[in-house]
């Protein structure tokens, strides 16, 4: 962030090594990667994207404001959690994921989420069906439990 003119930015978020900075169109920063390498000895990436991505979430701007959707691929990968020990732990995990995924129950802007995912993964298909399935499993305690076998016995 210290390498960019934050006085020109109109929004910025920082968390650990992740940042999202909105700058006016047309500003050029061609040497940011090389400068970061020389100053801090790490690799910095500057992306010019239509859709924001910050801390595993897509920031989708629309005519009435914006909505923040969690990354569906990250949520699906979390379903493979191997540290769960029994069905009580599975239920706690479901409630936690349900809390993270709450905005996915609003499908009004899935078409824009599709566009945002395609911006990062050009060969990805539409996400509506997958998200609806994910929401169905997260909102049904018994259905979610059926994804796991009880290894505590």
Curated annotation (Swiss-Prot):
Keywords: Nucleotidyltransferase, RNA-directed RNA polymerase, Transferase. GO terms for molecular function: RNA binding; RNA-directed RNA polymerase activity. One of its GO terms (biological process) is DNA-templated transcription. It comes from the Viruses. Signal peptide: none annotated. It catalyses: RNA(n) + a ribonucleoside 5'-triphosphate = RNA(n+1) + diphosphate. InterPro entries: DNA/RNA_pol_sf (IPR043502), RNA-dep_RNA_pol_alsuvir (IPR001788). Its EC number is 2.7.7.48. Belongs to the tobamovirus RNA-directed RNA polymerase family. The replicase large subunit is an RNA-dependent RNA polymerase active in viral RNA replication. This is Replicase large subunit. It comes from Cucumber green mottle mosaic virus (strain watermelon W) (CGMMV).
């Amino acid at each position: 962030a210290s390498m960019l003119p934050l006085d020109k930015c109109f929004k910025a978020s920082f968390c650990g090594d992740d940042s999202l900075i909105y700058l006016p169109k047309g500003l050029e920063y061609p040497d940011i990667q090389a400068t970061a390498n020389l100053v801090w000895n790490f690799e910095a990436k500057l992306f010019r994207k239509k859709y924001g991505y910050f801390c595993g979430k897509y920031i989708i701007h629309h005519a009435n404001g914006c909505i923040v959707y969690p990354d569906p691929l990250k949520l699906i990968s979390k379903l493979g959690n191997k540290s769960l020990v029994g069905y009580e732990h599975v239920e706690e995990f479901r409630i936690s994921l349900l809390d993270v995924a709450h905005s996915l129950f609003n499908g009004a802007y899935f078409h824009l989420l599709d566009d945002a995912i395609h911006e990062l993964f050009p060969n990805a298909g539409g996400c509506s069906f997958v998200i609806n399935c994910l929401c169905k499993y997260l909102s049904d305690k018994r259905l979610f439990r059926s994804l796991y076998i009880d290894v505590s016995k």
